[in-house]
Design a protein with these regions (language model features):
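An amphipathic alpha-helix signature
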Residues: 13, 81, 85, 123-130, ...
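Helix-turn-helix
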Residues: 10-11, 15-58
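Hydrophobic alpha-helical connector segments
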Residues: 57, 68-98, 143
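Amphipathic alpha-helical segments used for helix-helix packing
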Residues: 85, 92-122
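Hydrophobic/aromatic-rich alpha-helical bundle segments in the mid-to-C-terminal region
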Residues: 112-123, 132-174
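Short, basic, alpha-helical segments at the C-terminal edge of helix-turn-helix-like DNA-binding modules
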Residues: 60-66
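N-terminal intrinsically disordered/low-complexity leader segments
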Residues: 1-7, 171
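Short alpha-helical scaffolding segments that buttress acidic/His motifs in well-ordered protein cores
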Residues: 87, 100-105, 143-150
């Protein structure tokens, strides 16, 4: 009988999600993970198999605990302006909030499993926007892309329209 696990797997996945969201997959070394998670390298490999295995677990957790619940909540919004305000506020909720976007930019094109998870998250967000705003004029897709674009610009430290300006625009067209 083996020794009991010396770390909390869920906490390790949560901490890894934050590291990957802030530093990206390529910018996060196994040493960064060992230090940031407070686990031994052997334990990390035993539980997750590889850095990629931990990344997939972190992205799955991010979808299940943050993105999909957000999409469900957005479906209840009273109009596109309210939906956009809620989405912008949610994506400003901390470092792990950027993991979906980071995965989309950095890994989805070259890793089919990451691409499938990113696609699942984006489809859920798009579906919420379409349900609230309809898709007749294409406004729903534009607003979904706008929310993600705001988050991307914030990550890059770039200027651009403020969330308030986007909200004002959404009110005019919604």
């Amino acid at each position: 009988m083996g020794r009991p696990r010396a770390f909390d797997e869920e906490q390790a996945v949560r901490a890894a999600a934050e590291l990957f969201a802030v530093r990206g997959y390529e910018g996060t070394s196994v040493d960064d993970l060992v230090t940031g998670l407070g686990v031994h390298r052997g334990s990390l490999y035993k539980v997750f198999g590889s850095k990629r295995g931990l990344y997939l677990a972190a992205l799955r957790r991010h979808l299940d605990e943050e993105v999909l619940p957000l999409a469900a909540a957005l479906r209840e919004a009273d109009g596109l302006g309210a939906l956009l305000a809620q989405a912008v506020a949610a994506f400003d909720g901390g470092p792990a909030a950027g993991l979906l976007l980071s995965a989309a930019v950095e890994r989805a094109g070259g890793d089919p499993e990451v691409g499938a998870l990113v696609g699942e998250g984006l489809a859920a967000l798009d579906g919420a926007v379409e349900q609230v705003g309809g898709n007749g004029s294409g406004t729903a897709g534009v607003l979904a892309a706008t929310v993600l674009g705001l988050r991307l610009r914030a990550r890059a430290g770039a200027g651009g329209p403020s969330a308030d300006a986007v909200l004002a625009f959404a009110e005019r067209v919604g």
